[in-house]
Every structure is written in structure tokens, then in C-alpha cells.
From Swiss-Prot:
Source taxonomy: Bacteria, Pseudomonadati, Pseudomonadota, Gammaproteobacteria, Pasteurellales
A Pfam family hit: UPF0020
Enzyme Commission (EC) number: 2.1.1.173, 2.1.1.264
Keyword field: Cytoplasm, Methyltransferase, RNA-binding, rRNA processing, S-adenosyl-L-methionine, Transferase
Subcellular location as annotated: Cytoplasm
Species this protein is from: Actinobacillus pleuropneumoniae serotype 7 (strain AP76)
GO cellular component terms, semicolon-separated: cytoplasm
Xref: Gene3D superfamilies: 3.30.2130.30, RNA methyltransferase domain (HRMD) like, Vaccinia Virus protein VP39
Family indicated by similarity: Belongs to the methyltransferase superfamily. RlmKL family.
Primary location recorded for the protein, binned into one broad class: cytoplasm
Keyword rRNA processing in annotation: yes
Gene field: rlmL
InterPro entries, sorted: 23SrRNA_methyltr_KL, DNA_methylase_N6_adenine_CS, RlmKL-like_Mtase, RlmKL-like_Mtase_CS, RlmL_1st, SAM-dep_methyl-trfase, SAM-dependent_MTases_sf, THUMP_dom
Name used for this protein in its record: Ribosomal RNA large subunit methyltransferase K/L
PANTHER family, sorted: RIBOSOMAL RNA LARGE SUBUNIT METHYLTRANSFERASE K/L, RIBOSOMAL RNA LARGE SUBUNIT METHYLTRANSFERASE K_L
């Protein structure tokens, strides 16, 4: 058994050097790092030891043939030429893992099929029974790697991938692979025999892997099925010796210095069961708790805090995550002075919310996600800085002090005015500072942060970090609960994308505006159901509507209709192309106890409806989109190009003393006064009168006009 054979251990990208060190320690192998793994030369006993003890390897492969192929015929000939009868019995099932392509073999499925054909044909030509393919529980797994013309055919000695330790029956959301968890621990700097705390432990993988390391429990000690069980070269006696030695190496006399916390008691129950399955239940203390109340379970010792907190791809929403990471950083500095911390995250920007300086960092993949692990020393200096920060109001404003100061100033001015006005939905910040290109709106006790799309010349990562900083500052300055802060990315509208649904939460609540109650939805659509900049326009329309027949075109959710009806309009007619928003308008009418018999709703293309309308109206409010090319409309619409065409139709249904209130959001809009005059209409620009205090910093957000018949 002293024959030296070169095997290949596969690993996740970035872990190759760590795996090399591990294999050298496990079986004193001669190792050579390659992309995606390590070639290691050892005895068969050494290979068994690697299979049993490696925490980082994904698979251990025994190369059978290394050759060059240029076509599928070359591939087939190579496979048929292997003496499979010396490797496994045809009565055993097999499966083919095929990785890689070249010019002739362009997909892995085809490559696997040709390998399967070659294996089956080999046995049939030798007069053996045809072996069966089993995808899920194969006795033998054949691994083929193809890189251009270079091909390696191997026997997979692992069977199932080695990250499948067998102890994890069930998981919470977004679990870590055990091999990744082991790598995180090894990179964390944690020393065996010192405390290890995971404040958001989930299903417990990090703590279980670390506890097994300290207890000397081989990660595959309880695995029953191996890829070598049906291999004819398997040495059962040697394997038995390796297994017995692994049992003897276990250290049962160690202190229980592992502590897991999680807010979810159901996930914690799964973690406890996983620990029992892994044989380390007696080493880990579990406790349900919020990270905001985290306390050091071993204040008299120095240890390591290790954690894989939630991030955007995993759980939660960004505002909640910013708050979570911020409070986590505070608790680390409060409770773990002198300790080390190692935090792994799929959103590196969130790690900045910890407000700690890292001394080492590592890149890694968690599935398709690019992740970052940062190591910190929680020094006395960091703790002192934290305590000093808490004496100042600016403790969170330090994140984005200019933004926080401006937001605070705006709040003092605007909220007093809003209370006097009788409104509880208004804008607090609107890209006042160019480096914080976003808007902050209040809807009663909710806050909406809308990020405007950054210019192409702005670094995406820098823009993302500024957004996170601004959200963090907004949470602190406003005092809003994290679950009541909504974050949106607003881009330049194209066509009718304001109608596209973003979510399906169905969370509606109403806000008040000059006596009107209006439903809003902050999560499901790009817009909320209420254009805040048109607040004074709606108020004015309501005052003008008393005793008049009122038409609301491009009505959106009908908020102007509500003001008109509440102020005594003789009748209202509301037109919009979207059934969703028309239903919303109906709900607004019901909320204000306004009967449908006097307030009609029609779903229609507004321009087409106008062309067919035979009624006349005394007051018309029209707020068309800047541009639209909806499939429901016969032609595209451009407000600059087509507004005279629209006025031509409106004049026809306007009473002799009637008024059109025309508004749009096109910056730089130019009214065609000559075209209006030819129609016998005149326009007065009242934009400055319809700009509320909370939008005075953005005077071009809309333009508004009063249009009448020219007096004879």
C-alpha cells in the first residue's frame, strides 16, 4: 500500500491554497495547486484520509485517463478503450458528470451522453450485461473534465459532494455550504480552545463546523455511501483502519465554548437538531435573541465573533439590513472589546455599516454571489470612538453628515408647515445635494426613499454606498421604524412602465390632504398612487369645481376627482387607460363616502374617448404623460408634439365659460400659443402658484396652465 498515486481534489474558486495546506496536514501529500482544485500525490490510505478528513474539498477524483480529443468520435473511442470491467461490475449503477466544452462538443449534456454510450457499449461488446444509469443514487460516478482538446476521465471516489456532511436535516433560508463555512472559520483567525459566538447563527453551520474541528470529529465520519464502495480497487481493510483511527482521534474532553443566537426560534430548533446529528450538541449553547440586545456570553475571556448576517440576496429589505448591520456594529463595540470578529456578506457595502476597520479581507463565492469576508480587531480605540459618538446627536449623521444635516433642517421647516396645511404626505428632501441624488417622502408614519438613477459617469459602487449611507442617516434622523421605510430605485420612465407591478404585497393605507382621504401603496408599483407635487393643483381644482361638471383625463388614481367631488362638483367623470388605477380611484371614492352615481369611471384610451365624446364639461383637468407608446393606444403620444391636437378635442367639449387645467411634467415644455390662438384658446402659466413649499427647491418638476376660450 505504499504505491504513490496522484489524485485531484476539487474546491471552490479561491480555496485552492487553503486546500493544499489542509491536504499536506491530513496525508503528508505532495501537492500542486491548479485552477479549481489541488493535485495531490499520496497512497491509497492517504486518499481515504483526505476523503474522511477534508473540510474544504468538494470531491476527490482518481484520474483514469488523461488525453487529447478533437471530436465526439475521439471522446467515444477514449471511453470505449478504458477497461471498465477492472473498475466496476456492470450490475452496479453509474452516472456521468461532464464538465467543459470545446468546438466539437458544445454542451455538457451531449458530452455526458457520449461517455455513457461508450461505457455501455464497452460492457456489451465484452459480453456483459448492460449497466444501468442512476442519476440520484449511482454506485459509481464517472467524472469527465474537458478544456479545449484536453480531457481527463476520473473515478469520483466521493460519491455525493463532500459538502454534504449528513448532519443537516433541514435549514433556514439561505444556508451556507459546509465547505464554505469551514473556509470562513479557517480564515477568521479563530483559535481552538477560545470562545466562538455567532449572533445570527441560522441553522448553525458555522458553529457546528467549528465545534467538530475542535472536537477532532472528521467531517465525513458518519457518511454511509461512498463513491469507492463499488470500485473494484477499493481496499476495505485499509479503509477500516483509517475509519478506526478517526474515531480514536476524537477529543471528548473539551469545554463548551460555542454560542449561537438567532431571532427565529424555529430556525434555532433546526440548528439544535443539526448539532445533535453532528455529535456536537453538548458543545454548543443556543439562545433565542435579537442582535440588538446581544450580550457577550464569555466576558471574562477573549474569543471571536463569527457571522453570516442576512444580505439583499438572502433575506429582508435594504433599510432593515442597514439598521441591522449598524446596530450589530454597535453591539460588537459595546460587548466584545478586545475580541476579534469575522463577518461574511454578499453585500460588501453593508459591512461598512458596522463602522469597524478591518485588518484582513477575503473574497469568496456563495453560489453565484460574489461575497466578502472581513476580519476585525475590536480594539479599545474602537470602543472609545463608539462611546464618544453616542454623546453626540451626529452619531449616525457621521455616516452622511451633509445629507443628515440638510434632512434635519428640511424636517424642521416642512413638518410644521404640513401640520398647518392639514396634510400628512409630503417631500422632505429632493436631491438637494448632488452627491445624494435621491428623494425622501413622508406618507404618514412611513418614509419612502427614492434613488434617482445615477449618471453613467458615476461609479456604481460609490453610488450604492452613498445610498446606503443616506438610508442609514434617514432612519436615524426621522426615527422611522425599519419596516416602515421603503427604498425604491427610480429610473427614467419609458412608455407606460409606471403601470408595471414591482411587488404583490397589497399594503394599502390612506393619507389625508386638505380633508380628502387617499389610498397609497408604497411597495407594489413604481409610483405610490399620489403625485405629491400636484397637491396644490388638486386643491385648486377642487375649489374651482363647486357646482360644475368635472372631467378628469389621464386620471391615474383619481385624486383630483376626490377633491372635486368633496368640494361640491355637480358631477365627475374620470377616465384612465389602466384598470388597476381606475379600481384604485373607485376605492378612493368609497373611502370618502362619495356615491358612484354622481362620479362615473371609464376605462379607455383617453384620446380615443375624447374623439367619441358628445358631452360638454365646465371644468376639465388633464395631466397627460410626457411620453407614451402603450400597446393599448393606437398611436404614440408626446406631450410637446401633440398638446395642440389634444386641445383641439378638449375645446370641442368645453362649455363657453369653461376652464381647462392642463399640467405635465416635461422639463422645458413650451406652450404653442399660436396654435392655441388658432383654436380660439388662450393660456395662463400658473406653475408658480401650484408649486407647494416642499417642492420649491425643484421649480421645474411640473408646469401648469389655465386655458380658456378667447373672449370676444
Amino acid at each position: 500500500m505504499t504505491t504513490q498515486i496522484t489524485y485531484f481534489a476539487t474546491a471552490a474558486r479561491g480555496f485552492e491554497e487553503m486546500l493544499k495546506t489542509e491536504l499536506e496536514q491530513i496525508c503528508q501529500a505532495e501537492c500542486k495547486v491548479a485552477q479549481g482544485g489541488v493535485h495531490f500525490t499520496t497512497t491509497q490510505r492517504g486518499a481515504y484520509q483526505a476523503l474522511l478528513h477534508s473540510r474544504l474539498a468538494s470531491r476527490i477524483l482518481l484520474p483514469l485517463v488523461t488525453t487529447k480529443i478533437f471530436s465526439d468520435l475521439d471522446l467515444y473511442a477514449t471511453i470505449v478503450g478504458i477497461n471498465w470491467a477492472e473498475i466496476f461490475d456492470p450490475r452496479d449503477t453509474f452516472f456521468v458528470d461532464f464538465n467543459g466544452t470545446n468546438r466539437e462538443i458544445r454542451n455538457t449534456q451531449f458530452g455526458a451522453m457520449r461517455v455513457k454510450d461508450g461505457v455501455v457499449d464497452y460492457f456489451e461488446r465484452k459480453g456483459f450485461a448492460r449497466p444501468t444509469v442512476d442519476k440520484d443514487h449511482a454506485d459509481i460516478r464517472i467524472h469527465v473534465y474537458l478544456d479545449r482538446e484536453n480531457m481527463v476521465v476520473s473515478l469520483d471516489l466521493s460519491g455525493d459532494a463532500l459538502h454534504m456532511r449528513g448532519y443537516r436535516e433541514d435549514t433556514g433560508k439561505a444556508p451556507l455550504r459546509e465547505t464554505l463555512a469551514a473556509a470562513i472559520i479557517l480564515r477568521s483567525g479563530w483559535q481552538k480552545g477560545t470562545p466562538l459566538v455567532d449572533p445570527m447563527c441560522g441553522s448553525g453551520t458555522l458553529l457546528i463546523e467549528a465545534a467538530q474541528m475542535q472536537a477532532g470529529i472528521a467531517p465525513q465520519l458518519h457518511r454511509k455511501h461512498w463513491g469507492f464502495n463499488a470500485w473494484k480497487g477499493h481496499q476495505q481493510a485499509v479503509w477500516k483502519e483509517v475509519l478506526e483511527q478517526a474515531y480514536l482521534q476524537q477529543n471528548e474532553e473539551i469545554q463548551p465554548l460555542f454560542f449561537g443566537f438567532d431571532l427565529d426560534h424555529r430556525v434555532l430548533a433546526k440548528a439544535k437538531q443539526n448539532a445533535r446529528n453532528a455529535g456536537v450538541a453538548h458543545l454548543i449553547q443556543w439562545q433565542q435573541g435579537d442582535v440588538a440586545a446581544l450580550k457577550n456570553p464569555c466576558p471574562e475571556q477573549v474569543g471571536t465573533v463569527i457571522c453570516n448576517p442576512p444580505y439583499g440576496e438572502r433575506l429582508g429589505t435594504t433599510p432593515a439590513l442597514i439598521a441591522l448591520y449598524s446596530v450589530f456594529g454597535q453591539r460588537l463595540k459595546h460587548q466584545f472589546s478586545g475580541w476579534n470578529a469575522s463577518i461574511f456578506s454578499g453585500e460588501p457595502e453593508l459591512l461598512n455599516c458596522l463602522r469597524l476597520r478591518s485588518h484582513r479581507q477575503f473574497k469568496a463565492k456563495n453560489g453565484p454571489l460574489d461575497c466578502l469576508q472581513k476580519n476585525y480587531q475590536i480594539s479599545e480605540r474602537a470602543v472609545a470612538e463608539q462611546q464618544a459618538d453616542e454623546l453626540k446627536f451626529e452619531q449616525n449623521a457621521q455616516v452622511a453628515p451633509d445629507f443628515a444635516n440638510r434632512l434635519t433642517k428640511n424636517i424642521k421647516k416642512i413638518e410644521k408647515w404640513a401640520k398647518q396645511q392639514g396634510i400628512n404626505a409630503y417631500r422632505l428632501y429632493d436631491a438637494d445635494l448632488p452627491e445624494y441624488n435621491l428623494a425622501v417622502d413622508r406618507y404618514d408614519d412611513h418614509i419612502v426613499v427614492q434613488e434617482y438613477a445615477a449618471p453613467k459617469n458615476i461609479d456604481e459602487q460609490k453610488a450604492r454606498q452613498r445610498l446606503l449611507d443616506a438610508v442609514s442617516a434617514t432612519l436615524y434622523v426621522t426615527g422611522v421604524e425599519t419596516n416602515k421605510l421603503v427604498l425604491k430605485v427610480r429610473q427614467k420612465q419609458k412608455g407606460t412602465n409606471q403601470y408595471e407591478k414591482l411587488a404583490n404585497k397589497g399594503d394599502y393605507f390612506y393619507v389625508t390632504e386638505y380633508g380628502a382621504k387617499l389610498w397609497v401603496n408604497l411597495t407594489d408599483y413604481l409610483d405610490t398612487g399620489l403625485f405629491l407635487d400636484h397637491r396644490l393643483t388638486r386643491k385648486m381644482v377642487g375649489q374651482m369645481a363647486k357646482g360644475k361638471t368635472f372631467l378628469n383625463l389621464f386620471a391615474y388614481t383619481g385624486s383630483a376627482t376626490i377633491h372635486a367631488a368633496l368640494n361640491g362638483a355637480k358631477s365627475t367623470t374620470t377616465i384612465d387607460m389602466s384598470n388597476t388605477y381606475l379600481n384604485w380611484a373607485e376605492q378612493n371614492l368609497e373611502l370618502n363616502n362619495l356615491p358612484l352615481r354622481n362620479n362615473r369611471l371609464f376605462q379607455a384610451d383617453c384620446l380615443q374617448w375624447l374623439a367619441e365624446c358628445r358631452e360638454r364639461f365646465e371644468l376639465i383637468f388633464v395631466d397627460p404623460p410626457t411620453f407614451s407608446n402603450s400597446k393599448r393606444m393606437e398611436d404614440s403620444w408626446d406631450v410637446q408634439r401633440d398638446h395642440i391636437k389634444l386641445m383641439t378635442q378638449l375645446k370641442r367639449i368645453l362649455t363657453a365659460d369653461g376652464i381647462i387645467v392642463f399640467s405635465n411634467n416635461k422639463r422645458g415644455f413650451k406652450m404653442d400659443f399660436e396654435g392655441l390662438a388658432e383654436l380660439g384658446l388662450q393660456a395662463e402659466n400658473i406653475s408658480h402658484k401650484t408649486l407647494p413649499l416642499d417642492f420649491e427647491r425643484n421649480p421645474q418638476i411640473h408646469n401648469c396652465w389655465i386655458i380658456r376660450h378667447i373672449e370676444n
